[in-house]
Amino acid sequence: MFSTSDQVSKMNSRILSALLILGIATCVIAGGFCPKSRHPQCDLSYKINDCCAQSDCRVGSVCCVEGCGNVCRAESDTPLGEKFVDGSECKHGHVFPKKWYQFW
């Protein structure tokens, strides 16, 4: 049969495995907030969107709404900026306002 040291060893490995999985899940779920906007106001007559979904950004970055367009920023632990909502209307690249003849 098994000795008590084998049973303790198996129990310890199961506990460590569970803690490891919990730790990894916490890292994946934690954070994910946008930091404070660097440029809340934009002086340009157009916007430049570098991202239109969270999947457009690298791991550890978040698609954030800035004054001059959406940009990928490093994740923050506190929600100080505005995170882009996947599924919202968005166009990559330079986005110009309506042409003068489209206002009427």
Swiss-Prot record:
Disulfide bonds join C34-C64, C42-C68, C51-C63, C52-C90, C57-C72. InterPro entries: Elafin-like_sf. Residues 31-76 form the WAP domain. It comes from the Eukaryota. Contains 5 disulfide bonds. The keyword Disulfide bond applies. One of its GO terms (biological process) is defense response to bacterium. GO terms for cellular component: extracellular region. Residues 1-30 form the signal peptide. GO terms for molecular function: toxin activity. Expressed by the venom gland. Keywords: Antibiotic, Antimicrobial, Disulfide bond, Secreted, Signal, Toxin. It is found in: Secreted. Has antibacterial activity. Belongs to the venom protein 11 family. 02 (wap-2) subfamily. This is U20-lycotoxin-Ls1c. It comes from Lycosa singoriensis. The lineage of its organism: Eukaryota, Metazoa, Ecdysozoa, Arthropoda, Chelicerata.
